[in-house]
Every structure is written in C-alpha cells, then in structure tokens.
Amino acid sequence: MSTNTVPAKQYREIFLKGHPIMDVRAPIEFSKGAFPNAVNLPLMTDSERQKVGTCYKEHGQEAAIELGHQLVAGKVKANRVDAWKAFFSEHPDGFLYCFRGGLRSRITQSWLKEVGLDIPFIEGGYKAMRQFLIDEIDTAPGKSEMLILSGITGSGKTDFVRLRSESVDLEGIANHRGSSFGRQHEGQPSQIDFENRLAIELLRHQEREQAKLLLEDESFLIGRNAIPKTFFEKMQQAPVLVLTSTLEERLPRLLDDYVHKMHAGYVERLGEEQGFIAYRDYLLGSLKGIYKRLGGKLHAEMTELMNKALATEQSRRDTSAHLDWISLLLESYYDPMYHYQLGKKAARVRFTGTHAEMHEYLSSLGK
C-alpha cells in the first residue's frame, strides 16, 4: 500500500496557499468542524461509520475492516471513487485526509491508486492540523504587538479595519457585526470553523510581516462565536486606539448596515415578499433581544417607531424614517454603554482620532 504522505511541516503552507483538501471523514464529523479549503467526500456515510465502529468495539479491528469493505463495495465503492477522481481531476494539486491520517486515509489512497491516481494524504489528519491551528491562535499575540481599535457604534470601525494590512477582521471571520443588530443573512460558522478561520487569518497576517496586529474591539462573544480565551485575554490587555466620528457620519452608516444591506440581502435570497418578512423579523427580533436592557417603556417606543418606519419603507420605498429609532437606540442604549466601557479602558488608550488621523497615526508606526 502506498505511503505517499504530506508531512506536518507543510501544514503552514497548506493553509497559506489554500491547497484543496478532500476530507474523507463521515459527514457528521465534517459538520462539526472543517477547514475552509476542504470538501467532504467521505469514505463512509454516518450510518456505515457507526456500524463499523460498533463492530470494532465488539469484535476488533480485523472484523471492523472486513465489514467496512462489505458495506462499501461494488457500485457503492465505484461511485465514491468516481467522485474522488472528479475532485482530483479538478484539483490535481490537492491532498486527502481523515481524522488521524490513519486507516481511512490509507484505504482511500489505495483505492485511488487502483484507478491510476497517486494522491498524498496528510500525516496526522484533521486532528493534528486542528491542533496546529489552535497553537497558532495561542502564540500569535506574542509575534506582533496587538492594538485594539475602539469606537462608538457607527464610527466605521469594521470598514476601517478592512482597509489596513496590519489588521485581522474578527467580525468578517464570524460573519456577524458583533452587536445586537449584527446578524448576517448567511448565518455564522460553527465555533470550530470560526477558530480554524481565525488561525488561518493570523498565519496570513504573519506572512505579511506586520509588526502590529490591529483588531476591532469585541466582546468575548461575536454573535454565537466565542473568541478563544487566551487570545481574548491578550486583547483585554492591549493598547486601545479610539476612532472618532460625528453623529452625522454615524447615522447613515447604521442606516446602510441595519436597513439597506439587510433588506437587499434578504430579498436577494428569498424574493421580494418573503425577503421583506425576513428583514422585518430580523429588525424586530434584534430589538426584542435587548428588551431587558431597554426596559418595557423604551422597547415599546422603539418598536412603534420601527413598525412605522417599516410601513413607510414598504409603501413608499423611503427608508429615512428608520433614522428615528436608530437615533433613539444610540442615545438611550449604545452610546451610554460605549462610554461606560471606554471609561474602564481609559488607562490603555494610546491614541484618539478621526479616520484620516487614525490612518496617519498607524502609518507613522511603520510596518
């Protein structure tokens, strides 16, 4: 049986170059966590894997292997090998892996060899590659000076971060804007996928040889994704840069984020009628999520303003009425909360400025 393998020392290169990977784990394993450049073409289905696992526990490895060959034989085997061939025909530079780089990788490699393809499998498999990425998250803060970009809601922190080569976009990785109204149309990655993507972005940051690591100020949770504990603790200790913006600049940004982009995204996915319903539910649901913090009276007032704005938008295609509840949300909720939180970080603040001033300051620090 072939022993054509990819050693662990190439993990970094695999992630940086985005090598296509065929993941032969069962679908249930893949769904719990995978890599951005991996495609799931399993050796066994979930039910087949379960049967083989039970057989292994009761009768040992040889019996389990024999059962596996019985379950994946004939047309079933041929169809899976055809799918693998198609993958490597499209991605001739690709690799394969299973959970530990063991038997499933070797069997898959052997069956591909039978049809004339000699495909390397990755030593250590998913488990070792995943540990490599976890270690990267833990050690990354010591490789560059971490800087935290803070700023009042609507100040444009995310847009600013995305313009800077020394930054890593945490909200982009989590697919969530990190606030009560931060949900996106596509949903968020699993926690494991979030961590894997974060680690890969940190590898890319190191590849750019940046002395600074600029991150947007975030809570421990970005939506449902948790920033890894060690990494978050370093963020809590890092110097803070405060991005300033006027109310006149902030309101159009938030109108665009909460209203224009979300409405357009839902309509694109679901059509005009269902899209508007989903968009309306997103706004009202986000407001309901902070009911306890707002209190009943304020929540009722905002709900009324929001419903009026939605009705005006639907009937007249005019979104300007949304500025009423957005203004009240800033005045009564976001702004007081921000000033309270910034007060606790006052000793860590290194610089305060507008977008232009912040760009100039960061550029003055050098690469």
From Swiss-Prot:
GO terms for molecular function: transferase activity, transferring alkyl or aryl (other than methyl) groups; tRNA 2-selenouridine synthase activity. InterPro entries: P-loop_NTPase (IPR027417), Rhodanese-like_dom (IPR001763), Rhodanese-like_dom_sf (IPR036873), SelU (IPR017582). CDD domains: RHOD_YbbB (cd01520). Its EC number is 2.9.1.3. Gene3D superfamilies: Rhodanese-like domain (3.40.250.10). Keywords: Selenium, Transferase. It catalyses: 5-methylaminomethyl-2-thiouridine(34) in tRNA + selenophosphate + (2E)-geranyl diphosphate + H2O + H(+) = 5-methylaminomethyl-2-selenouridine(34) in tRNA + (2E)-thiogeraniol + phosphate + diphosphate; 5-methylaminomethyl-2-thiouridine(34) in tRNA + (2E)-geranyl diphosphate = 5-methylaminomethyl-S-(2E)-geranyl-thiouridine(34) in tRNA + diphosphate; 5-methylaminomethyl-S-(2E)-geranyl-thiouridine(34) in tRNA + selenophosphate + H(+) = 5-methylaminomethyl-2-(Se-phospho)selenouridine(34) in tRNA + (2E)-thiogeraniol; 5-methylaminomethyl-2-(Se-phospho)selenouridine(34) in tRNA + H2O = 5-methylaminomethyl-2-selenouridine(34) in tRNA + phosphate. The active site is at C98. Residues 15-138 form the Rhodanese domain. Signal peptide: none annotated. One of its GO terms (biological process) is tRNA wobble uridine modification. PANTHER family: TRNA 2-SELENOURIDINE SYNTHASE. Belongs to the SelU family. Involved in the post-transcriptional modification of the uridine at the wobble position (U34) of tRNA(Lys), tRNA(Glu) and tRNA(Gln). Catalyzes the conversion of 2-thiouridine (S2U-RNA) to 2-selenouridine (Se2U-RNA). Acts in a two-step process involving geranylation of 2-thiouridine (S2U) to S-geranyl-2-thiouridine (geS2U) and subsequent selenation of the latter derivative to 2-selenouridine (Se2U) in the tRNA chain. Monomer. This is tRNA 2-selenouridine synthase. It comes from Shewanella amazonensis (strain ATCC BAA-1098 / SB2B).
